[in-house]
């Protein structure tokens, strides 16, 4: 099998990822589980050749120089793929994540109605958080697509690398990739404010300057979508504030309390039938109570505010997990493994 055949096999089997690792057969991740493909192990030369086949000259140069590289590419009629190529103790390796060519709608994702409302906010910051592989990019792509189909405006994305490719519908969409199109997230965000955007998607808010620029954009009348690798709304607030030096924390709390529209923290759960995965969400909205808690550094009290905020669309992760168990979508055991308070899910 060549790389295209392996990727076609991966897509056909609804795999989220294809793993290539010298010394072992190729493997795919299906519904969260890694499974071996029933072919002979690949040696270093084979894996290296497969990786080189899908790289351009710049990516090859970066791989040789830095020993690892991130990029994305598309196979017409199949899908788009996000790639991390690296080296390990047996030789070359790569993980290729499937990015569907067709962006799923919020309805197809069974997303809460509030996600559509958030996508149409005129300004402020909407953060989607969760561990790697929790579907953050899929959720954000659906929200951006909803805005694109509903309103007239300019959406600018800054990604590393570009994942979902958006077609301009009602909105003009410009997508920029760190490397080929801009030197850094920071440079792109500074430039973005002079590019007349209505909404900005920041692929990853990974450092102080990126977070500062994203918050500034939200504060100056733009809708900013962003991601963090935090597992809850409270941890997200802590993470943002902890990045800044002590003398700035009070000002940052004030900025965040003014600009935050929502934090959506999600995780993927295996369905009861074992035929797929479903997202479970904690949803915290920028209500006046939440804004006050951010301003007053009372992050620990957020959980109870979220718990009692169902009338406005808020929910804790455990509340959503409980609902999924009641609807027979996931098992109590699966919920217990994901829950903040596992004792709530006996059995």
Describe the predicted segments one by one.
Residues 1-347:
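Short, flexible helix-loop junctions that flank or precede catalytic/ligand sites
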